[in-house]
Amino acid sequence: VQVGSIECLQSAQNWQRKSLSLQGLNLLQSVLIKLTTGKISITTSSGEYITASGPMLIFLAKDQTIHITMEETHEQLNYNLIELDSASIKNAYNFFLYEHADFSAPLTKPTTKHLLAPIETGVARVFNLLHSSNKSQKLSQDKKEYLIRFLLSEFI
């Protein structure tokens, strides 16, 4: 399926297919994907190839176009995603780099536009809380940024 925006990826889960391929997704904002079950393969406009099986947390940086293939493994494909605005990512970066040097984030600029991390205890619940609050606007901006920092700390 040829598409343009990331909203198509979220709604594609309702199509209930064993495999799904979406071409030309433009990431205007960074995206955090919680892959619970299934397998995902992503090719980016910069030539990176990413493959992961659930449970896995996947971060994709903004300003790139991706081609994504998702398929069932032993269970039905199950994933959710959250778009992250630039201000939240910048706040998290500054928090880890300047306020908590014990995280020792590297000072070199990353060469990839993606990150992968296994889903640890509590991460899925925090992701689900943030995902549902984005729809219902229940949480304050401060609480959302705290939860985003928690999720992004999985990649350190």
Give residue ranges: language-model regions.
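N-terminal regulatory/effector-sensing and dimerization cores
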Residues: 2-105
